[in-house]
Curated annotation (Swiss-Prot):
Biological source species: Rickettsia peacockii (strain Rustic)
Protein's GO biological process: valyl-tRNA aminoacylation
Gene that this sequence comes from: valS
Record-level GO cellular component terms: cytosol
Domain writeup: ValRS has two distinct active sites: one for aminoacylation and one for editing. The misactivated threonine is translocated from the active site to the editing site.
Entries under InterPro entries matching the protein: aa-tRNA-synth_I_CS, aa-tRNA-synth_Ia, Anticodon_Ia_Val, M/V/L/I-tRNA-synth_anticd-bd, Rossmann-like_a/b/a_fold, tRNAsynth_Ia_anticodon-bd, Val/Leu/Ile-tRNA-synth_edit, Valine-tRNA_ligase_type_2
Protein name: Valine--tRNA ligase
Main EC class the enzyme belongs to: ligase
Biological classification of the source: Bacteria, Pseudomonadati, Pseudomonadota, Alphaproteobacteria, Rickettsiales
Length: 812
């Protein structure tokens, strides 16, 4: 008989199994298996934008629980890993790391530095993802900046151009003056900021004073109208008249519009091009002129004696206020707190500029997208409302132009040929991927075209993350149409809740526009990982947890255990207590396996190879049969929970069964029969060892999606040299059931619980002998009574039926 190892070294074993799994290609996708038998995951490509943190471990392992389960259920798994390594987030990382600014250096040199940085950062991700045992097929890896990804992203653009779902227009857009780029509505966040409401004197053309209130007096040079509410009796007499702006003496119309709030300020509002979205609405509705005074760098460009030209926005605001005070045109100021739209990444307050940009039609599809949201299977269901709320709130088409460098270029040029100046020239699909700064459209020379210098929003590429893996966009645009048709739509999109409005929304939009379908059948939403005090982790607070230290301290299985204890979609605080519980569970699994291992040499070889269903008749003891029935019930419950993406429920059920039903009760109750050193009950002994053998094997399989290393190690020691994680290794006991009266076994457990409490109260050892157990309320079978005698160390047990309530009298 081989020896059971003395102890479990997680550091050595985890590295060992990670290497073996890779070498044996345990997680390899088989492209020859039918679509119906394949389970396809749209893995979140992590943004290459900074330090790895415990949140990466938290969310990615939760996906892996489901993937491992589906593989064990017999599915051919397509589980890729990508890296979202283009766009503004990566540029900001590079600028910070290298202490450089993209705009201060050659474009090609900056791109080269970006490529070097992302290669280094991605290797860190690969290392971490292997350490936490993500069962991805690394041969399916992609980068959003790779030539193939650029080709597919540009295919997406051309397909939407062909479908007339993309357009180029010169219209107001949200502009980040810090990062120097246009942004989409989803790239902004509302921030509460303190400011002043400034009450300023205008005049009518007749010289009558008018008071308007504004938070942005620096936009006075861009004022094109003054508005009042049509029902506001204070100002109805102004209809058809004009106002004169202070300092700049520009004549602007006085107009009525229902968007004016009568209760805000004075009820008179100046319309500037542009201070906010209402200004845009008024500008369009009333056909007002355009006055642009803000540059792309966030400075004022307006030649005037007020000397605000060249000043930054805040500086210009202060300067204008000072001048208004000097000329007694500022009546008063009120301290206010108001909501300001800011760039999500730079944090800068946004401006609205008029710049030619590419847009994807979005507003016209809102109703269709709401229907798509309802067609999708949401896990958990309550997350659907977040997407619905976002769709309902959309007020802009999706601006996909970015004035940056490290991104996917638009496959576009503009003609300079005589007679067709400005004509948009699109690349032919056979040319993709192209860089219009280096390549040329078919039939044109360099002198005849102007390239589009912008790059696409990074979401424009990551929104086709499924297609980056399937290698196709639509029937007309595909690198490998057979592969695309086999993998798309996918089965699962796992992601965090804060990017529902971006990644989920944009991917649904693209799939809808490209192929009139959903991109996946299911979406699984994870929450945030919080600090132990339930605050959000941040570098400024110093509470960011680094995965490497935790892996060194606890190992991957314990960290995965912590992640599995978090309910799907819920924000969860890091917990040392949960980590310690996970470590305790690993140790208990090891010790329980060590106990059952010593009995396995007593089993016949054919019974070890047979399934539990095949050797059903050899399990003869009543308590063993009850144990198997409880195991079958557990398998059904855990399987159902995992099929519904409720990994935490499955983990909880399995762990509770292991600790309470198996370790605390079954191992103790069957121990005497399992040893049976005097050979008093060979049939009962064989029954118990068979039960131990199959229950332990099943429990290892139920724990395997969550704790892959310890379960693999024990499975190899106890059962097989084949991996526990291979396709089709899950258990199915749907046809297994013993026809027994469960009340007997449950009565035994109730009596045992009473005896244990009695001995604990008396400070007696659990093995302390008992002369007599007097039990009323139940009569156990001879087999169960014998097990009860053994586990309680009772010399004699007497039963009588007085009533249905179990009572126990203990005589020492």
């Amino acid at each position: 008989m081989k020896e059971f190892p003395k102890n479990y070294n997680f550091t050595e074993n985890e590295k060992k199994w990670q290497q073996i799994w890779q070498e044996k290609q345990i997680y390899a996708y088989n492209p020859n298996v039918a679509k119906e038998e394949t389970y396809v995951i749209d893995t979140p490509p992590p943004t290459v934008s900074g330090q790895l943190h415990i949140g990466h471990v938290y969310s990615y392992t939760q996906t892996d629980f489901i993937v491992r389960f589906q593989r064990m259920m017999g599915k051919n798994i397509f589980y890729p890993m990508g890296f979202d390594d283009n766009g503004l987030p990566t540029e900001r990382l590079v600028e910070k790391q290298k202490q450089i600014k993209a705009y201060n250096m050659d474009r090609s040199e900056f791109i080269k530095i970006c490529e070097e940085v992302v290669e280094s950062e991605e290797e860190k991700f690969r290392s971490l993802f292997n350490q936490i045992a993500l069962s991805v097929d690394w041969s399916l890896e992609y980068q959003t900046i790779s030539p193939l990804s650029r080709k597919i992203s540009q295919m997406s653009f051309l397909d939407l151009v062909q479908k007339e779902e993309i357009y180029l227009t010169n219209q107001p857009i949200l502009w980040d003056p810090v990062d120097g780029t246009a942004l989409a509505q989803a790239d902004i966040e509302d921030k509460e900021k303190t400011s002043f409401m400034n009450y300023i004197t205008f005049k009518t053309e007749q010289g009558d004073p008018l008071t308007i209130a504004t938070t942005r007096p620096e936009l006075l040079p861009a004022c094109v109208a003054v508005f009042y509410h049509p029902d506001d009796g204070r100002y109805k007499h102004l209809a058809g008249k004009s106002a004169i702006t202070p300092l700049f003496n520009e004549q602007v119309p006085l107009l009525a519009d229902p968007l004016v709030r009568q209760d805000k300020g004075t009820g008179l509002v100046m319309c500037c091009t542009f201070g906010d979205q209402t200004d845009i609405t008024w500008w369009k509705t009333h056909n007002l002129p355009l006055k642009t005074i803000i540059t792309k760098k966030g400075t004022i460009d307006f030649q005037h004696e007020t000397s605000i030209d060249g000043l930054k926005i805040k500086e210009a605001r202060t300067k204008i206020i000072d001048i208004l005070k000097e000329q007694e045109l500022l009546i008063k100021q009120e301290d206010i707190t108001h909501t300001v739209k800011c760039a999500e990444r730079s944090g800068a307050p946004l401006e609205i500029l008029t710049v030619p940009q590419w847009f994807v039609k979005t507003i016209s599809h809102k109703e269709e997208l709401l229907k798509r949201a309802n067609e999708l299977n949401w896990h958990p269901k309550n997350m659907k409302i977040r997407l619905e709320n976002w769709i309902n709130a959309i007020s802009w088409d999706w601006c996909i132009s970015r004035q940056r460098y490290f991104g996917v270029p638009f496959p576009v040029w503009y003609s300079k040929r005589v007679g067709e100046e400005g004509k948009i020239l699109y690349a032919d699909v056979t040319q993709l991927p192209i860089d219009p700064l280096k390549d040329l459209p078919m039939g044109y020379s360099k002198e005849e075209v102007e390239p589009d210098y912008d790059v696409m929003d990074t979401w424009a590429t990551s929104s086709v993350s499924p297609q980056l893996s399937t290698h196709g966009i639509s029937d007309d645009f595909a690198v490998n149409k057979d592969r695309h048709d086999k993998l798309f739509p996918m089965d699962l999109r796992p992601q965090a809740h804060e990017i529902i409005r971006t990644w989920a929304f944009y991917t649904i939009l693209k799939a809808h526009l490209h192929q009139n379908t959903l991109p996946w059948k299911n979406i699984m939403i994870s929450g945030w990982c919080l600090a132990e005090d339930r605050s959000k982790m941040s570098k400024s607070k110093g509470n960011v947890l680094v995965p490497e230290k935790l892996l060194e301290q606890y190992g991957s299985d314990v960290i995965r255990y912590w992640s599995a204890n978090s309910k799907l979609g819920a924000d969860t605080a890091y917990s040392e207590d949960v980590m310690k519980n996970g470590k305790r569970l690993v140790n208990k699994l090891w010790n329980a396996a060590k106990f059952v291992f010593i009995h396995f040499d007593k089993l016949k070889g054919e019974d070890k190879k047979a399934s539990l269903l095949d050797i059903k008749e050899k399990i003869t003891n009543e308590f063993d049969k009850w144990m198997v029935n409880k195991l079958v019930e557990l398998v059904k419950l855990a399987t159902n929970e995992l099929q519904n993406y409720e990994y935490a429920h499955a983990m909880h059920l399995t762990e509770k069964f292991f600790w309470v039903v198996f370790c605390d009760n079954y191992l103790e109750i069957s121990k005497t029969r399992s040893y049976d050193e005097e050979h008093k009950n060979p049939q009962g002994q064989y029954s118990s060892i068979l039960t131990l053998y199959h229950v332990m094997q099943t429990l290892l399989k139920l724990f395997a999606p969550f704790m892959p290393h310890i379960t693999e190690e024990l499975y190899q020691i106890l059962y097989s040299k084949n991996s526990i994680h291979v396709k089709g290794s899950w258990v199915n006991y749907s046809d297994l059931n013993y026809e027994i009266n469960a009340k007997g076994a449950e009565g035994l457990l109730e009596i045992l619980d009473i005896v244990r409490k009695f001995k604990a109260e008396k400070n007696l050892s659990i093995k302390a002998p008992i002369k007599l157990l007097e039990v009323s309320g139940i009569v156990l079978s001879a087999e169960l009574a014998e097990d009860l005698k053994n586990v309680t160390s009772a010399e004699e047990i007497q039963f009588e039926m007085k009533d249905d309530k179990i009572k126990v009298n203990i005589i020492l």
